[in-house]
């Protein structure tokens, strides 16, 4: 299965039980910042934004004072799982990032998708990739 298929079929899919509700953008990005696959709507990010995200996984709390930036959009960092998941909020939407052994799985959402639904979609794929040694 190609990385693009993971994004299209496992991240940008309808959310279980909520036909027509889906993430607004998603991607799988290597730890080095290289894009493995992304939705057409995923923002163009700057290398320093990805560096900040990777630093926060290695030093939890790093982004809390400044916020998480992706594609020029600032998200307020909310509770995550140290070293494993970063979550951010902006207005009625937000972002979930799950770290695997080799990649970061990104999901960006807006209402009517809820933070919990985004977390479920992103973390389910991230956990699967971890189980596969990726």
From Swiss-Prot:
A GO CC term assigned to this protein in UniProt: cytoskeleton
InterPro entries according to UniProt: PFN, PFN_euk, PFN_sf, Profilin_CS
Keyword set, alphabetical order: Actin-binding, Allergen, Cytoplasm, Cytoskeleton, Disulfide bond, Phosphoprotein
Disulphide linkage map: 13-118
Record localization: Cytoplasm, Cytoskeleton
Post-translational modification: Phosphorylated by MAP kinases.
Modified residues (Phosphothreonine): 114
Motif (Involved in PIP2 interaction): 84-100
An example molecular function term from Gene Ontology annotations: actin monomer binding
Pfam families found in the cross-reference section: Profilin
Primary location: cytoplasm
PROSITE patterns: PROFILIN
Keyword Phosphoprotein carried by entry: yes
Lineage top rank: taxon: Eukaryota
The keyword NADP is annotated on this UniProt entry: no
Database matches in Gene3D superfamilies: Dynein light chain 2a, cytoplasmic
Subunit note: Occurs in many kinds of cells as a complex with monomeric actin in a 1:1 ratio.
Main function: Binds to actin and affects the structure of the cytoskeleton. At high concentrations, profilin prevents the polymerization of actin, whereas it enhances it at low concentrations.
Entry's family note: Belongs to the profilin family.
Further details from the record: The variability of the residues taking part of IgE-binding epitopes might be responsible of the difference in cross-reactivity among olive pollen cultivars, and between distantly related pollen species, leading to a variable range of allergy reactions among atopic patients.
Protein name: Profilin-3
Native source organism of the sequence: Olea europaea
């Amino acid at each position: 299965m190609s990385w693009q298929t993971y994004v299209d079929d496992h991240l940008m899919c309808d959310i279980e039980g909520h036909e027509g509700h889906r993430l607004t953008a998603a991607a799988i990005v290597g730890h080095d910042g290289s894009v493995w696959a992304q939705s057409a709507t995923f923002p163009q990010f700057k290398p320093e934004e990805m560096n900040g995200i990777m630093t926060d996984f290695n030093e939890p709390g790093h982004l809390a004072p400044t916020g998480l930036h992706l594609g020029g959009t600032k998200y307020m960092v909310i509770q995550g799982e140290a070293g494993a998941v970063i979550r951010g909020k902006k207005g009625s939407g937000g972002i979930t990032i799950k770290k695997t052994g080799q990649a970061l799985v990104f999901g960006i959402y807006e209402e009517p998708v809820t933070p919990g639904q985004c977390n479920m979609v992103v973390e389910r794929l991230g956990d699967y990739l971890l189980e596969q040694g990726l």
